[in-house]
């Protein structure tokens, strides 16, 4: 089930994007064009002879492309999509005991959980697999459409389809969505925050990602530049605390506390940690 709360693109500038496609995929490209247009994105269709690595290198600007695997974001010779199917090996290894995120979010209790910083949806995919009922909130129309496409593909996968009904995609601004829950006096068990730009450690040094800031994240940073508007984080914490019994914030291990607020509890891993705030 997908939900449009009407505020997904309210604060975003007008967007225009190319979709590159081979002629065999024209119908799919036209479908994505119509969907994106309904979400405020003007899309120019660009049929090409061959969508391959050479073409992507020669056309480095941020764009979309369509092939037999659906919709992709491309730039600088790379392309990416949330690709939930690629997460299957990780999911099959995961248990409530082995996953720190499961302990932090109490997934064994099958919570209703709002993921207010959707990203590529991989953490939500894991949490849904382990039993949570997920409300996955994303306001950027292109990223939301990529997530929607990944979920649609997952619904046809024998393994992933078993728990896709536990993931609800919501096209909305996370702050507005949390405010709406508060105004309607609705609560959830958990709000999960994984800000894309944690930036600084305790010594105010910029945090370096792993040598390969994943290809996916490189392209996401191009789509969602750190311009203040897209840097989801500090302002969501207080909103989340109003509607959830438990707020869990994922941070790089040495990052400063979100909004400089010390958590009530922490779970520490080698590369990241989970900070907990309780109501």
Swiss-Prot record:
Enzyme class: transferase
UniProt-recorded Gene Ontology molecular function terms: rRNA (guanine-N2-)-methyltransferase activity
Keyword hit for Ion transport: no
A GO CC annotation given for this chain: cytoplasm
Chain segments annotated as coiled-coil in the UniProt record: none
Keyword terms, alphabetized: Cytoplasm, Methyltransferase, rRNA processing, S-adenosyl-L-methionine, Transferase
Binding positions for S-adenosyl-L-methionine per the UniProt entry: 138-139, 194
Record has Secreted as a keyword: no
Catalytic activity: guanosine(1516) in 16S rRNA + S-adenosyl-L-methionine = N(2)-methylguanosine(1516) in 16S rRNA + S-adenosyl-L-homocysteine + H(+)
EC number: 2.1.1.242
Localisation per UniProt entry: Cytoplasm
Family annotation (InterPro entries): 16SrRNA_methylTrfase_J, SAM-dependent_MTases_sf
Family: Belongs to the methyltransferase superfamily. RsmJ family.
Role according to the record: Specifically methylates the guanosine in position 1516 of 16S rRNA.
The name this protein goes by in its record: Ribosomal RNA small subunit methyltransferase J
Naturally occurring in which organism (per UniProt): Acinetobacter baumannii (strain ATCC 17978 / DSM 105126 / CIP 53.77 / LMG 1025 / NCDC KC755 / 5377)
Taxonomic path: Bacteria, Pseudomonadati, Pseudomonadota, Gammaproteobacteria, Moraxellales
GN (gene name): rsmJ
